[in-house]
Amino acid sequence: MSSDIQTADNKKSEVDPRHEKRIELLKLLFAFSFRPKQEPVEQLKKIVAQLSEIDQTISALAPERPLSEISKIDLAILRLIVFEWTSSKTPKKVLINEAIELAKEFGSDASPKFINGALSQLLEDNK
């Protein structure tokens, strides 16, 4: 039994630091969504500076759901991933996978499917 615990501990220590950074940014973006007039913390300044363009992209990906009807956590996940999509060299399929994992961890039961659908559309549009 102790080997099972050790295996679980080893898996916890193997968490990708990029995933941990995304979780931290996601939490900051989520909190920012409740106080958008407040000056963003340093880690969010680049994302907030592009928020208008990011939101336009999200609106185009999910035209049946106005931004105001997307849950704040789903919107934060989409904003984070769309920002990274345009500003990093991370493979697009990796970003979609990461978004789905974040949705499973922080969103509702419907979040992973919604986010997968929206971001898959982005992948299709950029082929």
Which residues does each predicted region cover?
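N-terminal interaction/assembly modules
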Residues: 1-112, 117-127
